[in-house]
Amino acid sequence: MSPEGEESHAEDNLYFHNTQMQSIHEETLAEESHAQAIQRSISRLSSFKHEDTDSESPIPVQKVIRQIKKTNTNTNTTKTKKRKLKVSKPRKNMSSSESVRQMYGSRKNGEQQGSIDGFLMSRFGEVDGCNESDRSSKLISQGEWESLSKFHEESNEKDKLLRKKIQRYYSEPQEELGEGCGMLTQASADPETKMTKEELESLYDLDSSTVFNQTTISAIGDMSEPTQVSEPCVVILSQTKVQSEASTQEDGADASVQEIKSTVPAQELFSTPEFVPAPLEQPVNKEMCSDQSIVVLEENVQSTQADDSDIVELISDSDPEPEEVSTKVQVLRSIYDSSGPVNDKQPSVASETVESDSTPIVSPVKTPQGTRMHVVQVASSNPSSPIKIVEENTEQQEEVFTDVESIYSTARTSFGTPKHTSPVILLESSDTDCDDNDNDVEPLSSMPMVKTVPKKRMRTTVLQVSAALKVQNYTDEKNNIKLRKIGDDIPVEVPTKDVEYEEIPDSQESVGGEGDNSVSIIEITREVHNNDYTGDESTDLFQVGLNKQDTCEDTSSPVVQIGGVENDILDSSLIEPVPEPESVPVPEEVQEQPQPTAIDKHTATQLREKFQLWGLKPVRGKEKMVEILQGISNFILPEHELLAVADKQELQSCIFRKLDAVIREGRAMYDRILSFEPIRLEELQSMLQSQDHYLELDVLRLYCDSSGITTTNA
C-alpha cells in the first residue's frame, strides 16, 4: 500500500471515532438531563409525603442468598434435595401491629409488613397520646380506655336512679307503709293491722260522730235498747281521698235528707204527688226488725239534669198523670219498713221498690196508691241500641236485572229501616187479692218491630228504536212497568252485522237503509215473577205485560200505542205508529222470532266453560258469547260439530287452516305478508268481514303470532 492510501485510511478511522465519541457524549448528556428532571420531580412531590419518625421503621436491605453447589457423586441424593427446595411452605396470617410481629412474627416478611404499616399510617393517621412504650397507633391507650369507661358510667347513672325508683315502688318497706303513704296497700299487705279512726275518716269521708271502736259504723243513739227505733244511718262511699266539690254537694244533699226524715216517717220519705210505694215486706230477722235504715249511693256527678232524649212514662190505674223519670239513674234509695207485717214467704219482685230520680229533693205529699202498674212504651228520638236491631231478610228485597251488564247481575233498590223505639220497662207490684200464680211476670220482648218489605224481582231492558218512532215516558204502577226514554235522535252508522241492541223498524225505508239513521234509546223495567223467571231467559220488549187501560199518546207526533190488548203479552204487532198517510205497516218478517240454534240452547255458564276450554277471551253477556261462537261456526264448522270439539289445539288448527286459505285467495294481503310488511289486525279483520267472515281480534292475534306474521298498532 502506498503512503497516500495509508493516510486516507487513517483519516477515515479518525472520523469514525470522532463521530462515535460525539454520539456517546450526547447520549450521556441526555441521560444526565433526564436524571436531573426526575430528581426535580421527586423533590417537588416530597412535600406531600407523610413522614413519621416515631412509627416509621427503616426498610431493611434485601439480602441476596446464593446457593453453593456441592459436587456429589450420588445423583439420587442431589435430585431429592432439589425437589425439597421447590416445595413452598404455607404462610401464616400476619398481624398489622408492629409490636405483635416483633413478639410472634419472623423477620422474613419485614419489608411487606413495613409497607403495610406505612399505608395504614398514611390512611388513618395517628391518635394523640397513644405512642407510649413504642406501641402502634392502632392500639388503644390507657387514657382512651379510662375515657370510655367513664362515659359508660355517666350514661348509666340515670338508668340506676330510675331502677332504684322502680324497686322502691314495688318493694314498699313496712316503715314507709306505717307513715301513711298507701293505706290500701297496707290493709292488703297485713290484714291483722287495724286502721285508725283518722284513716277510716279520710278513706270513707265519714262524719266523726258516726264512727266508734275504729272498725264499726252505726247510727247515733242508744245501742243498748234493741226495741228502740233508731234513726237511719246515712253512708256515703267515695273513691277519692281528697274531698272534691261533688262530695261537698253530696253532704248538702244528705243534710237535707236527714232534715226531712226527722219530720216525715220513713214510709213517706220517697212519696210523690203521683205515686206512693207499696208496703214493703222483709223476711223474718229478729236483729233487723227493730232497725230501720236508709242507704244512699251517689256518684260524683256534676250535672243531675234530666235528659230529654230518654224519657219513660209510668201510668198508674188510680192516677193517669204521667211522671217523667230520667233513665240516667244517679241516686238509688232503698226503704226497709219494719213496722209492716212479717211474711214468711219469699219476697216478690215488688217487695223492694227502686225509684229513679235525678235530684235528692223529695216531696212529702202522699198520693193514692195504685193496685197494679202497667207497662207503657213511649217513642223517643234517641235511636235504639245496635244490639236490638234485627237484620232484615235479604230475600225480601227488590232486585233489578240489567241486560247491558249481565243477566245475573242484581242491585238492591230498597232497604227496610227499623223503627226507633224506646226500651220497655217491666214493673210488677204485689197484690194481696191475687193468687200466687197471678204474680208470674210474662217476659216482654224489647226487640223493635221491623216492617217486612215485599219481595220484588225487576228486569230492565234497553232497546234501540228508530227516531221516527216517538215514545213518551210511561209508568204502570198496577203492573209495575216503567218505560223511560234515555236518548233521542242519536245518529249512528249503518251496521254491517248484528247489533248489540234490538232494532224495531217502523217503515220500509228504515228497513231498506234508505231513511234516516238516527235512533232513540228507551229503557223498560218490569216485574218478573218467580214462575216465569229463569237464568237463561232472554230479555226483550216482547216479554213486557201491559194492561188494556194504559196507553202512551202524543198528539204532536206519531206515537206508539201500548195497551188496549186482550192478552198480557206484548206482541210485535202492537208496536205500530199512529195511522198516517205516509206510514207503512211493519212487514211480516219482523213478527217472526228466529228459531233457537244449538248454541242458543246452552246456558251462559256452559258457554263460559266452552270459552275457557278453547282458550278464547272471556266476554260479558250470553248474547256476545253466542255472537262470537256463531262467527267461528260460520267460518269453519257447523254449530253441532263446533260444540263437539273438545280440544283447544284442534279448534285452533281448524281456524288457522281456514285463515291460510282465505289469505292466499286475496293476493294483496298475501303479498304484504310475504314481504314482511307489518299489517294491522283491524285491516285483516275488515278484509275478512268483507267476505262475511267474523272473527275476534284476539283470535287473529293468536294466528299472527303462531304463523310469524308481523303486526303493528300504528
UniProtKB/Swiss-Prot annotation:
Region (Disordered) location: 1-114, 338-369
Tagged with keyword DNA damage: yes
GO BP terms, alphabetized: DNA recombination; DNA repair; DNA replication
Compositionally biased residues, Polar residues: 36-46
Membrane-spanning intervals of the chain: none
Composition skew (Basic residues), residue ranges: 79-92
Alphabetical UniProt keywords: DNA damage, DNA recombination, DNA repair, Nucleus, Phosphoprotein
Principal location: nucleus
Keyword Coiled coil: no
Extent of Basic and acidic residues compositional bias: 1-14, 24-34
Localization annotation: Nucleus
UniProt record similarity statement: Belongs to the SLX4 family.
Function: Regulatory subunit of the SLX1-SLX4 structure-specific endonuclease that resolves DNA secondary structures generated during DNA repair and recombination. Has endonuclease activity towards branched DNA substrates, introducing single-strand cuts in duplex DNA close to junctions with ss-DNA.
Listed name of the protein: Structure-specific endonuclease subunit SLX4 2
Higher taxonomy: Eukaryota, Fungi, Dikarya, Ascomycota, Saccharomycotina
